């Protein structure tokens, strides 16, 4: 990556993306954020120049700058990513921390946040706009569809499939071969030994619906 990056979102996910880019000596041009209180202020020495629809900066995309979408809300990330594709014909780059590990035989889509210490092993597949927290592990042949979030230290074992929009909490373990449904939620520290239905929330060891 040679172009500077504009980060859409200057809160927690944006700060982690900044850290990932800077760990690889990638220049971050600026933040854009819709929270007025942040605008024209610095976040970790990078200025929040305007809002996420500011054409003065978005017109640079694809020519002079790349972009990463770091909105905190999944729906907002989806909306911003669609806007970038439809109006500016660009897709977000990945923010992969220098101290993560991504196998050369893994497959990643666009706009993913892969944080420090995360591991993505051989033949794993990660879709678009996923958030892989620090020290989270995606083992061989596991599949994460778009917009999946893994908390810090989550363990996704071999052959697991996690559908779009699902959330796996901090330190949770998903046992090999399990399927997690669309928009399901797995609580922190849970051990998932059976499939989880779409939109279901599970907690505990073994994980059970709540």
Region roles according to the model:
Residues 19, 82, 190:
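Active-site phosphate/pyrophosphate- and oxyanion-stabilizing loops and adjacent acidic/basic residues
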Residues 1-52, 56-59:
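Hydrophobic, well-ordered beta-alpha structural blocks that scaffold small-molecule cofactor pockets
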Residues 94-210:
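Structural signal for interior beta-strand "rungs" in well-ordered beta-sheet cores
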Residues 9, 68-72, 176:
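Small/polar loops that bind or transfer phosphate-bearing groups
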Residues 12-13, 75-76, 107, 191:
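Short alpha-helical
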Residues 15-19, 78, 194:
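Alpha-helical elements of the RecA-like P-loop NTPase motor core of helicases
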Residues 39-101:
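Phosphate-bearing ligand-interacting subdomains
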Residues 10, 33-34, 72, 97, ...:
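Cofactor-binding loop segments of dinucleotide-utilizing enzymes, especially the Rossmann-like FAD-
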